[in-house]
Regions:
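Membrane-proximal helix-turn-helix segments that form the acceptor-binding/catalytic region
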Residues: 2-31
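Helix-loop-beta element that forms the nucleotide-linked donor phosphate-binding surface
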Residues: 23-31, 39-59
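Acidic donor-binding loop of glycosyltransferase active sites
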Residues: 139-154, 165-167
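Short hydrophobic beta-strand element within catalytic cores of glycosyltransferases
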Residues: 158-161, 168-174
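Short acidic/histidine- and often glycine-rich active-site loop of Leloir-type glycosyltransferases
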Residues: 173-188
């Protein structure tokens, strides 16, 4: 994807990398990882097995009633536009969304969060609303949430709430880091690579929307 990020993100990434190295090399520290892949990598590079464990994110899954589907008319991004997130949203708006709208012309893309107004472009059916001031999530019914993360680097806590609320979403592999892959069901929780992101969303839109109970 030929990504470039600004100096702020580079600075934070460098600081986090140095801290991670300090923790890994500390023989008195007990390491807790958020995914089995991270744990396996640590054990591979260090040869240590007794000073580490994994605590994966396991939200409580709601009961889903697969009743008569309703059509989905909106894609939703819920989150601020920080420097590294902007790269992901730019990629989605410029590369992914046109493919989706070419297949399903009536679909709209709505963004809520800090600095999302910069994307407001009604002529392209893109609506940047700014901060969401209400409780819960915007436009839950008749909407599909998207998490087009192309950088990764941490657990996306909003996914935790989407999972527990039974709100359908499509995420990149990077955006699902730290979560148990057993939760992926290809209906309410879809995870795919960047190459097939548009196709996964189109397929999910054609499935319709299912109510949760």
């Amino acid at each position: 994807l030929a990504l470039k990020v600004d100096w702020k993100f580079d600075y934070l990434l460098d600081a986090a990398t140095k801290l991670e190295k300090e923790i890994i090399n500390d023989s008195l520290a007990y390491k807790i990882f958020i995914s089995q892949e991270d744990l396996n990598f640590y054990q591979l590079i260090t040869g240590r097995f007794s000073d580490c464990t994994v605590w994966p994110f396991r939200p409580k899954l709601p009961n889903i009633s697969l009743e008569q589907p309703k059509s989905i008319s909106k894609l939703i991004w819920f989150g601020g536009i920080d420097t590294h997130k902007k790269k992901s949203i730019d990629w989605f708006v410029n590369k992914v969304l046109p493919k989706i709208q070419q297949s399903i012309s009536e679909i709209e893309f709505h963004l809520w969060g800090r600095r999302t107004e910069m994307y407001n472009n009604p002529s392209r059916k893109i609506f940047g609303h700014g901060f969401w001031v209400m409780e819960g999530f915007p436009c839950v019914e008749g909407a599909l949430y998207v998490n087009p993360d192309i950088i990764g680097g941490g657990v996306k806590l909003k996914l935790f709430s989407l999972i527990e609320e039974g709100i359908p979403f499509v995420s990149t592999v990077f955006g699902f880091e730290g979560y148990d892959k057993k939760m992926i069901d290809n209906s309410m929780r879809i995870v795919t690579d960047t190459e097939h992101f548009a196709e996964a969303i189109i397929s999910r839109l054609q499935m319709g929307y299912y109510n949760n109970v």
